[in-house]
């Protein structure tokens, strides 16, 4: 595929070059601003919306009244009466089943948007300029690998087509049939509730046919899936950039292609079919930044590059890195060695002291055993226990003590001793 500049070849209905050339209109060199295209597309698309709203009575067609406080239930209004499940249920609130929605929609919403005329023209210029770049067109998914040239211009004889078979044959000759096959392959069922609203099927977009006069071309192309037809005097950004994305594959008739300079003008001459309008200017005449920066004018103004290399030294922690510590303090090695030796010496002293104490304790216990005349018995842990000495039981405490305690014997009543008066016999 060729992207010819500044002349464009005109192709015949047989798909071959007719030998005629057309000068590339200046609008194809306009700045491409995807942000403006997206903004204009978003706002213009809102103008197709139809007002909708819920009923003003929805959710309020019941006799409900709050029960007030003191019943340990929420204070939401409740349906009156009895004998049915509905009685006592909450009503009116947006949190209730059968209640109204929050902030019910109204028909007096601001549905439509006004867009500046200059902005709309800028967006159309950007969309047309993007349609001439094969990379952008292919990024949109159009199958233009075999198309001979972009922009693709055909003779005006095509505007007189009235049969669909003629249009299909033309697309085959121009190698644009692959884009139509892509549309057929993409036909599928819509997701969501649009299926119930006469929008069951969706499909991809195909080529956009732009003509100057309708001599039957609309009837010839309108039944081919994915095809969009536009009059060059009534270009629509919603069709040139579907979804707000630039890069639609466009097929032009020769007269429509020649008319673009009159519609949008050149930078040297204003548009003749529009009142005081000219193409938007580029912010940069030359967008090749590398070429600009390497130009002798800029290089002359720049200073020579500094080639001195400053190596960044990694600072290491001397408390964790012995090599760095020895660089800072060579005596640190001697200090560390002395510390290790002192720790080893202290450890040996502790071990010897513990061994001497154990030996003294052993000798003392042997002495006591010899005095008692009993042979000492060595226990499991190396301690000597006296033979014949019973181990005292620990006193029981709590419930165990109460369970094992023997009941005290019942005390007999003490017999009274006779007093001196009782001992004396009666006279």
From Swiss-Prot:
Modified residues (Citrulline): 300
PROSITE patterns, alphabetized: RIBOSOMAL_L1E
Covalent crosslink: Glycyl lysine isopeptide (Lys-Gly) (interchain with G-Cter in SUMO1): 364
Cellular component per GO, a single term: ribosome
Keyword annotations from UniProtKB, A to Z: Acetylation, Citrullination, Cytoplasm, Isopeptide bond, Methylation, Phosphoprotein, Ribonucleoprotein, Ribosomal protein, Ubl conjugation
N6-acetyllysine, modified sites: 14, 106, 259, 333, 353, 364
Region described as Disordered: 369-427
Modified residues (Omega-N-methylarginine): 97
Phosphothreonine PTM positions: 266
GO molecular-function terms, A-Z: structural constituent of ribosome
Record PTM text: Citrullinated by PADI4.
Cross-referenced Pfam families: Ribos_L4_asso_C, Ribosomal_L4
Biased composition (Basic and acidic residues): 407-427
Positions with biased composition (Basic residues): 377-397
Chain positions found as N-acetylalanine: 2
Cross-link (Glycyl lysine isopeptide (Lys-Gly) (interchain with G-Cter in SUMO2)): 239, 327
InterPro entries reported for this sequence: Ribos_uL4_C_dom, Ribosomal_uL4, Ribosomal_uL4_dom_sf, Ribosomal_uL4_euk/arc_CS, Ribosomal_uL4_euk/arch
Single Gene Ontology BP annotation: translation
Modified residues (Phosphoserine): 290, 295, 365
UniProt-annotated location(s): Cytoplasm
Cited PANTHER family: 60S RIBOSOMAL PROTEIN L4
Record text on subunit structure and interactions: Component of the large ribosomal subunit. May bind IPO9 with low affinity. Interacts with RBM3.
Functional note: Component of the large ribosomal subunit. The ribosome is a large ribonucleoprotein complex responsible for the synthesis of proteins in the cell.
Family from the record: Belongs to the universal ribosomal protein uL4 family.
Protein name: Large ribosomal subunit protein uL4
Organism from which the protein derives: Pongo abelii
């Amino acid at each position: 595929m060729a992207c010819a500049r500044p002349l464009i070849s005109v192709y015949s209905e047989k798909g071959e070059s007719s030998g005629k050339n057309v000068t590339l209109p200046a609008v194809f060199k306009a700045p491409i601003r995807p942000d403006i295209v997206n903004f204009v597309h978003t706002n213009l698309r809102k103008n197709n919306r139809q007002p909708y709203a819920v009923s003003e009575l929805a959710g309020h067609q019941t006799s409900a009244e709050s029960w007030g406080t003191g019943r340990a239930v929420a204070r939401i209004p409740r349906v009156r009466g009895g004998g049915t499940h509905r009685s006592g249920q909450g009503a009116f609130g947006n949190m209730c089943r059968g209640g109204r929605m929050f902030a019910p929609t109204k028909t007096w919403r601001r549905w439509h948007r006004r867009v500046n005329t200059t902005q709309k023209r800028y967006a159309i210029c950007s969309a047309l300029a993007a349609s001439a770049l094969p990379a952008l067109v292919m990024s949109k998914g159009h199958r233009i690998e075999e198309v001979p040239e972009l922009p693709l211009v055909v003779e005006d004889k095509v505007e007189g087509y009235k049969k669909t078979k003629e249009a299909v044959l033309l697309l085959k000759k121009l190698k644009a049939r692959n884009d139509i096959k892509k549309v057929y392959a993409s036909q599928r069922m819509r997701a969501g509730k649009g299926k119930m609203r006469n929008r069951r099927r969706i499909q991809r977009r195909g080529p956009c046919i732009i003509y100057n006069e309708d001599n039957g071309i609309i009837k010839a192309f309108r039944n081919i899936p994915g095809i969009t037809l536009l009059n060059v005097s009534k270009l629509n950004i919603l069709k040139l950039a579907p979804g707000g994305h630039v890069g639609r594959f466009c097929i032009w008739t020769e007269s429509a292609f020649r008319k673009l300079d009159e519609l949008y003008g050149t930078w040297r001459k204003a548009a003749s079919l529009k009142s005081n309008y000219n193409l938007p200017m580029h912010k940069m005449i030359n967008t090749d930044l590398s070429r600009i920066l390497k130009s002798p004018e800029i290089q002359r103004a720049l200073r020579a590059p500094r080639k001195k290399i400053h190596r960044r030294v990694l600072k290491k922690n001397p408390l964790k890195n012995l090599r760095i510590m020895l660089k800072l303090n060579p005596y640190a090695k001697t200090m560390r060695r002395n510390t290790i030796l002192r720790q080893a010496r202290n450890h040996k002293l502790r071990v010897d002291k513990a061994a001497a104490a154990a030996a003294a304790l052993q000798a003392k216990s042997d002495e006591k055993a010899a005095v008692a005349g009993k042979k000492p018995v060595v226990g499991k842990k190396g301690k000597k226990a006296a033979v014949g000495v019973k181990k005292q039981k620990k006193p029981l405490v709590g419930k165990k003590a109460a369970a094992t305690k023997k009941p005290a014997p019942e005390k007999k009543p003490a017999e009274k001793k006779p007093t001196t008066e009782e001992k004396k016999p009666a006279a």
